[in-house]
Amino acid sequence: MHNKINLLKEKFEHDLAKNKNSLENLIYLEQKFLGKKSFLQELNQTLKNIPSEKKPAIGKLINEFKKTIILSLQKEKQYLKTQKMNLELMQESVDVNLPGFNFSTGSIHPLYQIIEQLEDLFLSLGYEIKDGNEIESDFYNFEMLNIGKNHPARAMQDSFYINPQKLLRTHTSNIQVKEMLANEGKPLKIISSGKVFRKDNDDATHSHQFMQLEGLVIDQKINFLNLKETILTIIKELFGDSQEINIRPSYFPFTEPSIEVDLVIRKKDNSKEYLEILGAGLVHPQVLLNANYNPEKYQGFAFGIGIERIAMIKYQIENIRHFYQNDIRFLKQFSKKVKHENS
């Protein structure tokens, strides 16, 4: 029996050396030596006829032979697979002389570029940036801002109500009210920005959703001159030193007095066109009282800027819809324009 096993070992080594260059031949060898009708199976059958006292030793030799066959075949198969993979990699190697691919580089949306420009300005002036909810209660969106349940000014901001108590905010002033309450009657200097929603008819210059940035300053001895200087700083940042403006009286329930600011655009015939740019005013005493400020001691001013309107005027964009359609041609064109101006 020992001689038979040794002869099979020699035969396997001979056949392996002859057939190891082909994966198909290795599979054939596997069947020949390990399959159901293989040499190894014949050895297992003859084991039945071996005397009992010799079976353990012979069985051990057979198992060692089987293990040798399995490991040898696995080694040669892996070698062939590695060779094949290396050959494929060489054939598929990258030609470094070929031109590369151009990948599109993203950029910040035009509206957020305007917001970031203004945020940088106000941070340099000592303001803090605050954020708040887009879904707001009627109480914080209207009543705390001196716009009662039956106040006619509510018609100016026809709104999207979720239920009788909740609505999509019509301005970012809800953030200001909450910050005033949290500040417990101390000086305050903040800006806030984000989406606001009004039931408007969408057209080239109006949208039911738009971006707004508002500012609020509360301290002792705040007056209209402080507000005017802030407005001039904003205009200078956005449109340069030479931009002419027009300040005219207006009405907002939460400020008194209230103003609106127009850009003065001179046409070729030297006539003037007035483009509304922002609303502002001194904080109404009732709003101060609502937020636990003493109007005899503290005063404040507030302003609100429509970001889309700024961008449309600044970059001569005729249709507000361009900001929301995600047309890559428009966004790329605008991105180049901004980079050119900042360079």
UniProtKB/Swiss-Prot annotation:
Mg(2+) binds at residue 256. One of its GO terms (molecular function) is magnesium ion binding. The keyword Endoplasmic reticulum does not apply. It holds the Pfam family tRNA-synt_2d. One of its GO terms (biological process) is phenylalanyl-tRNA aminoacylation. Belongs to the class-II aminoacyl-tRNA synthetase family. Phe-tRNA synthetase alpha subunit type 1 subfamily. This is Phenylalanine--tRNA ligase alpha subunit.
